Amino acid sequence: MAPRFLTLADVAETLNISASQTYALVRSGDLPAIKVGGRGQWRVEATELESYIARMYAETADFVRTHPLGRDDVDAAEPDLG
């Protein structure tokens, strides 16, 4: 059975981002978390992380819909093999 709560390091690994980026997500309120223990270590509930990921997929899909890819974007993304 998967753990209910994840450390910030676990979250960082899952999202493939740095520990400081994970901390910023928590401190900004974008990723709900709780402080536990006498030293106030952060924990993120696994269901909250899954909800965050789903929100990011939805926000990205909305962004892609409202910002269609133009030819200049495609040209900029293609490597110069010449």
Model-assigned labels for residue ranges:
Residues 1-24, 46-82:
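Basic Lys/Arg-rich amphipathic helical interaction modules
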Residues 15-42:
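Major-groove DNA-recognition helix of helix-turn-helix-type DNA-binding domains
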